[in-house]
Amino acid sequence: MNTSHKTLKTIAILGQPNVGKSSLFNRLARERIAITSDFAGTTRDINKRKIALNGYEVELLDTGGMAKDALLSKEIKALNLKAAQMSDLILYVVDGKSIPSDEDIKLFREVFKINPNCFLVINKIDNDKEKERAYAFSSFGMPKSFNISVSHNRGISALIDAVLSALNLNKIIEQDLDADILESLENNALEEETKEEEIIQVGIIGRVNVGKSSLLNALTKKERSLVSSVAGTTIDPIDETILIGDQKICFVDTAGIRHRSKILGIEKYALERTQKALEKSHIALLVLDVSAPFVELDEKISSLADKHSLGIILILNKWDIRYAPYEEIMETLKRKFRFLEYAPVITTSCLKARHIDEIKHKIIEVYECFSKRIPTSLLNSVISQATQKHPLPSDGGKLVKVYYATQFATKPPQISLIMNRPKALHFSYKRYLINTLRKEFNFLGTPLILNAKDKKSAQQN
């Protein structure tokens, strides 16, 4: 969120010692910042932290417990009342397992008098049966209170919604979100990318006798893989590593795949080994024989890349003896493999080693896209613009809204949309968003996984 033109909204957490103030602070901050224990008065200083609540930047204050008999109680109380006066909203936390004391009510009313923008938060209501205990706090005189359990993560989502509403933050445009704050929303799901060199794992797939072994030999310039016109020569996956610049690439020549009705004995074993090899791969080279028309099995084999969420490059082999003109083959390819429209296409003749260097460099380019991570602020800006250009369809007349987006994984890129009604995200609108992201960020040859979650699921994950 760009805060140059506005002051951050401040939320102060107040209450007596050992009611769960620091635990609530940690829960909202999504980090273990404040020390928590069963010993009253653990927090003495005011912990201050910029945090994000569903994508909105606020400043959160965790104050010391205001116990009458505590050491330095006068100083702590004075500091807390000053924090209350300067805050936009106060969360006054009480222990739902205890009977309200006169001292607690007196302190609350003193705080409320200084700043009436105050929520009564009743903590430690761990289940529905304990809700009855919350009625005892009606003596505080608040028309509405919030029953929560920080330790069980109950009621937190509703509290956050109410806080955002009270601070009028639900009117802020999502594209105004600050990149650093949004990074914290990923909740450490996306580990920091390792700087160690990684070998790109490439699986070569295709039906029997389309030229996979010839392609491996051309790529590695070795006769490592036996080449024969006899179908099914390759049984075990064969791997070979090469170096392009300073990047290592490991190729796996998998067993050719034929119709299931013809898979017997050792070929069934070979298919299982192929599946296991692909589980470890980053990119698939789908080899298609263009000396004859494509067959249904080609399409089925291509689904292996989707099944294992691999980057993919289409290799049209035997181009020197292609069965039809360029335009006709490309039109057929587009029609039969329309779900792979994002995949680059390279024509080659493996036996004559044509366009082999192009394949090598394309592998590196696709891997860079496969490993890509979008800056969170930029991601939200693009999503916001897309939803403004074409608003989300309503869900039975009810508004459907994307609160924010976050990329939580790479290889392949995986993005979550945090929404008020995630189940209402239609597949056609999801496809529109994916196409928008592809156009904006160039995910060449890379599957892009987009899912929708509600705020509660996002917080739990």
Swiss-Prot record:
GTP 1 binds at residues 15-22, 62-66, 123-126. Coiled coil: none annotated. Residues 372-456 form the KH-like domain. GO terms for biological process: ribosome biogenesis. It comes from the Bacteria. Keywords: GTP-binding, Nucleotide-binding, Repeat, Ribosome biogenesis. InterPro entries: G_ENGA, GTP-bd, GTPase_Der, KH_dom-like, KH_dom-like_a/b, P-loop_NTPase, Small_GTP-bd. GTP 2 binds at residues 206-213, 253-257, 317-320. Pfam families: KH_dom-like, MMR_HSR1. CDD domains: EngA1, EngA2. The keyword Nucleotide-binding applies. GO terms for molecular function: GTP binding; ribosome binding. Residues 9-171, 200-371 form the EngA-type G domain. The keyword Cell membrane does not apply. Transmembrane segments: none annotated. Belongs to the TRAFAC class TrmE-Era-EngA-EngB-Septin-like GTPase superfamily. EngA (Der) GTPase family. Associates with the 50S ribosomal subunit. HAMAP family: GTPase_Der (MF_00195). GTPase that plays an essential role in the late steps of ribosome biogenesis. This is GTPase Der. The gene is der.
